[in-house]
Amino acid sequence: MITIDGNGAVASVAFRTSEVIAIYPITPSSTMAEQADAWAGNGLKNVWGDTPRVVEMQSEAGAIATVHGALQTGALSTSFTSSQGLLLMIPTLYKLAGELTPFVLHVAARTVATHALSIFGDHSDVMAVRQTGCAMLCAANVQEAQDFALISQIATLKSRVPFIHFFDGFRTSHEINKIVPLADDTILDLMPQVEIDAHRARALNPEHPVIRGTSANPDTYFQSREATNPWYNAVYDHVEQAMNDFSAATGRQYQPFEYYGHPQAERVIILMGSAIGTCEEVVDELLTRGEKVGVLKVRLYRPFSAKHLLQALPGSVRSVAVLDRTKEPGAQAEPLYLDVMTALAEAFNNGERETLPRVIGGRYGLSSKEFGPDCVLAVFAELNAAKPKARFTVGIYDDVTNLSLPLPENTLPNSAKLEALFYGLGSDGSVSATKNNIKIIGNSTPWYAQGYFVYDSKKAGGLTVSHLRVSEQPIRSAYLISQADFVGCHQLQFIDKYQMAERLKPGGIFLLNTPYSADEVWSRLPQEVQAVLNQKKARFYVINAAKIARECGLAARINTVMQMAFFHLTQILPGDSALAELQGAIAKSYSSKGQDLVERNWQALALARESVEEVPLQPVNPHSANRPPVVSDAAPDFVKTVTAAMLAGLGDALPVSALPPDGTWPMGTTRWEKRNIAEEIPIWKEELCTQCNHCVAACPHSAIRAKVVPPEAMENAPASLHSLDVKSRDMRGQKYVLQVAPEDCTGCNLCVEVCPAKDRQNPEIKAINMMSRLEHVEEEKINYDFFLNLPEIDRSKLERIDIRTSQLITPLFEYSGACSGCGETPYIKLLTQLYGDRMLIANATGCSSIYGGNLPSTPYTTDANGRGPAWANSLFEDNAEFGLGFRLTVDQHRVRVLRLLDQFADKIPAELLTALKSDATPEVRREQVAALRQQLNDVAEAHELLRDADALVEKSIWLIGGDGWAYDIGFGGLDHVLSLTENVNILVLDTQCYSNTGGQASKATPLGAVTKFGEHGKRKARKDLGVSMMMYGHVYVAQISLGAQLNQTVKAIQEAEAYPGPSLIIAYSPCEEHGYDLALSHDQMRQLTATGFWPLYRFDPRRADEGKLPLALDSRPPSEAPEETLLHEQRFRRLNSQQPEVAEQLWKDAAADLQKRYDFLAQMAGKAEKSNTD
């Protein structure tokens, strides 16, 4: 047996039964594609002895089209997708079904974006394609996901009907469980060679040509559609036979419809997907209580066989609940319910049933909403009611339409040998550690191990909760652990926020990672936690994992330490056995990164065993603090009730009435979150400061702020809040203040690294230095609160805007959930400092939409006048077109308001009317609009003009997204929008990979970089988006890098915004996926520009009107070879260690390519210069 997750299990079968695989990343299906690509890169073979060809496409539409072409020419082909990706495939799925083309698409089912995007699991995507004509087979767990991947492949070849094999996103795709793997011989024996040969014989071939894809007319189209009926009528039998053949080969028997429960059941639940295992557990328990209940598992959903459904349903049943994991607003009911109801009604009408059971329908589990035993008990209880609800929801509290069922207490006995919860911080290694623990237990013991991981959409820095179960029996529990034998808190700050000890079983183990020793930690715990630990009679332990990790050179990665502590305390494996297994796992995971890293992790294991301390339980200390409120009392009511509950992990309990129905949320809620995740924060040493504001500009989270204020504003300042006389001539007589937001800083250290001011006696000391947050937080909180209330600078009064002055303007993008050290967010922050009070932002899906609009807290905020960026996200693929709609509307509204001005011209002073129709700065225009409103306030007929007069204030339209959007999936729209003459500004945050989905290659990925979907190094040069858009001639194009030239960045943004047409800014954005310490990113950015890797330029068509060449090249010719600089990044180093000979050639190719690109730019700029690297 093997321990594996659902995606891995499916990918293994799909890879071995395919010849061509077209891929594109989308959560939660991406890892299937990643593994297929990696296996192909390593030369692994399919069951026929060939290595499948794996190709990444620009979108899911491209992937399915490639599959279509491969199938039409005789290949066995597949792809993997989810959610919006599946929807992009719909037109081609219709074609595949209409052409009776055998093929399997593997889908990790996920929520489709509606009022909000959600990466989590339900059936809304697969239900949106049920009309395409594809057969649909649903797996309920990891074992089924693997097995059905093969059964669907057999059935599609037998039936010629394309199959969608789906399973629940995250709950199955990412659940780790112990399964029986399929051997190559078994797969090969089961694959129907006769049908494979027939598929190949139908291939398009000029040796025996045919025509497909014709355009039909009314005389024959209808008949042709009906001609496929026999093939669909035969699908059920093909699937059943494939399942029987599979059983004969493996011993695992499945049926398209399968009943589980009492043979004379009176109450039955019908559903499909991962919730089946939970229902089976409840059925088992209720059977022991003498109740006649059961569950009917739907596996083959399309074609839907009413005959076989009714054969599987006990004739004794008197009430049925059909559960759908989707919502179809406006429909009579959800899809599975309607199918079941139709089957029963037709059977009754045809005389095949004498009576009809009562059938009720419910929705559950949307967006991975928890569906546990209590939900199943509630449904069975409703089936017993005299008048059950015909339509209901379960798992939420609906106080608006009152559809929800009350949830009883979960009374199921627990048979697990061990249940454990691990609370970690995204990027601290907790999830990876738990995955290793599960695999160690599963692979080295006869026990079954299950792992599931709960996290939000933050890339890093968010809460992660890992669930681990160990049992002597196969684990069916597809729900979260509510009471655990072991709870590990990997971050001290969580003690104040989350109810963790409350989830401990009586006598359970509570392990806390803390800098405080066993002697001092008790008084540091909130009184509530002390009381719970006493109540549970917990065994309480502490370890200073962060200290051990630092001592072993592992930075913030505490996973190795916490893994060893878990095994040491639970003794689920004997101590020496656990140590040996962990050492082996470390060697396997890190050997490619060098033996030194392996040995440092081994050292951490040894120290961890020695460092765990037990803390005796003590009475509640009356001098200890209470758990602080989740948000400040000063927060708005909505934040205190709704946002606070979500921040505390209690959002599941919020009623329907508490939430906005249309997805509209308040701004600026990150200011109330106060994550406190930094171990160290920057402290200002003012006597060394040059007031350059580089630290403020570099800060990814707007957690360092600078202000220039009148001296009197500092008269009542806290003693620890320092200020300096302003050095700049244009601000003489004022005070300069620099201050950190101590609870919002992520501790990335970037500010310290970019600070140019050093102590002459000790260059290690700078004008800002990292110091312990715990030692400084209380004092700095007081300072920051005072700082925020200091007067703001008036942007319009600044003599010039450069990097120094721009950073005195309060940002309207703050404390986002981006990764620590993120290279994207400083650009967005700068935009809001320059134009935030009049910005409209269309944001493509990706990292920037997640840290920009991920609940429960959002970073875009408003100024003192209530103005700020108005932000919206549509989709990944359509952002350019979406933003164009903003521009067209703004222009149209302005035209209408100007028309209304003319209509009331006789009531407006001539001077004001002329001014309103002339150019003006936004500040002046707002004064004019205020004057207009005052002038027409008593004119009742002018209400429309007064209401909409703000349209006269010019809006700054920005279309923001990453390189995956701009270079790949959204390129067609971006290209079209730029081909127009509309005044839109496009900012591409170029990380050179799909950062949000885990670092897959895009067309922006450079030569030689190793990424997911490019495990053996990019073999071709990156697409030059900037140069290609220059070819239009009328587009402003700039390539910038904040770390390379701060002021060039500011200048390019200002020019782009002022340009009266389309503009494109491509901003180099360091990312964690690049594989180096992002604290050093600005230095790396400078070096990359020096090598020619990222030249800086501004292409301004207006320069041609002045008799100049449009292109201004702002960086010098390459002055050094790129190899040394690129090898600072793991994405380039990996190729050196994997394939040194290939890497050596690619470095030469890269140097030549960079030089050629620079020479082309220099020629365009009239600066034909020779490289300094020759």
From Swiss-Prot:
Its BP terms in the Gene Ontology are:
electron transport chain; response to oxidative stress
Keywords on record: 4Fe-4S, Electron transport, Iron, Iron-sulfur, Metal-binding, Oxidoreductase, Repeat, Transport
- Which residues does the record give as [4Fe-4S] cluster 2 binding sites? C699, C745, C748, C751
Which reaction is this enzyme known to catalyze?
A: oxidized [flavodoxin] + pyruvate + CoA + 2 H(+) = reduced [flavodoxin] + acetyl-CoA + CO2
Q: Which domain of life is it from?
A: Bacteria
**Any one GO molecular-function label of the UniProt entry:** iron ion binding
Cofactor binding annotation: Binds 3 [4Fe-4S] clusters per subunit.
User: What EC number(s) does this enzyme carry?
Assistant: 1.2.7.-
Q: Which residues bind [4Fe-4S] cluster 3?
A: C819, C822, C847, C1071
Q: Which SMART domains match?
A: EKR
Family membership: Belongs to the pyruvate:ferredoxin/flavodoxin oxidoreductase family.
Name assigned to this protein: Probable pyruvate-flavodoxin oxidoreductase
Q: Which organism is it from?
A: Escherichia coli (strain K12)
